[in-house]
C-alpha cells in the first residue's frame, strides 16, 4: 500500500511499503532497509523564472554535473515534459575509482521550483532497486504554487 508524504509548499511523495524518509540539513533521504542504495532529494527555489521548466531542468542537470567534474555525454540526458513540470535525467557509472558508483540523477522543475533527486548505489546492485527508486520519482508531484 505505501504512504503519502507531503512536504509543505513543495511536493507529494508516494513511498512504497518499506521505504522511509528522513530530513537532513537541506535535503531528504529516502531509504529502504537492507537496500544497497538511497534516494536524496534537494529542494531549490528558482531564481531565474523566464526559462521554460523543461529547458531549465536540463540546464540545472548540466550545471550540476559540470560543477562536480562528472564527464558525461550531453546526448545521454533524457528529457520528459509533464503537465506540471519539466524533467531531465541521466545515468552515470563511475567504474574507475576504488568505490564503483552508479548515480541516476533527475531534475524536476516547475515554474518557480526545482527538485534534484539522486539515486546512488553500487553498479553491481542495479536492477529492480533502481527501477523502484525511479517509480518513486516518476510518481512525485509538485503541490500547486500559490505564486502562479
Give the residues covered by each predicted segment.
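Loop/helix-junction capping segments adjacent to catalytic residues or to phosphate/diphosphate-binding pockets
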Residues: 51, 98, 126-127
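Surface-exposed amphipathic alpha-helical segments
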Residues: 19, 116-148
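Beta-strand-connecting loop/turn residues
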Residues: 24-28, 84, 112-113
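Short glycine-aromatic motifs
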Residues: 2-3, 18-19, 72, 76, ...
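Secretory pathway targeting signatures of secreted, lumenal, and periplasmic proteins
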Residues: 2-59
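Signature of long, low-cysteine stretches enriched in small and polar/charged residues
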Residues: 61-111
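Long, highly charged amphipathic alpha-helices
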Residues: 56-63, 135, 139
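Glycine-rich, often proline-containing surface loops adjacent to acidic residues and nearby aromatics
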Residues: 37-40, 86, 112-118
Amino acid at each position: 500500500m505505501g504512504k503519502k508524504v507531503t512536504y509543505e509548499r513543495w511536493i507529494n511523495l508516494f513511498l512504497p511499503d518499506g521505504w522511509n524518509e528522513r530530513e537532513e540539513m537541506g535535503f531528504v533521504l529516502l531509504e529502504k532497509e537492507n537496500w544497497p542504495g538511497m534516494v536524496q532529494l534537494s529542494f531549490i527555489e528558482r531564481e531565474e523564472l523566464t526559462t521554460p521548466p523543461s529547458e531549465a531542468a536540463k540546464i540545472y542537470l548540466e550545471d550540476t554535473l559540470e560543477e562536480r567534474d562528472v564527464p558525461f555525454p550531453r546526448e545521454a540526458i533524457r528529457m520528459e515534459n509533464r503537465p506540471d513540470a519539466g524533467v531531465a535525467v541521466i545515468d552515470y557509472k563511475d567504474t574507475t575509482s576504488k568505490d564503483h558508483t552508479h548515480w541516476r540523477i533527475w531534475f524536476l522543475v516547475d515554474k518557480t521550483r526545482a527538485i534534484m533527486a539522486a539515486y546512488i548505489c553500487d553498479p553491481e546492485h542495479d536492477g529492480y532497486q533502481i527501477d523502484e527508486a525511479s517509480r518513486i520519482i516518476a510518481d512525485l508531484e509538485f503541490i500547486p504554487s500559490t505564486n502562479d
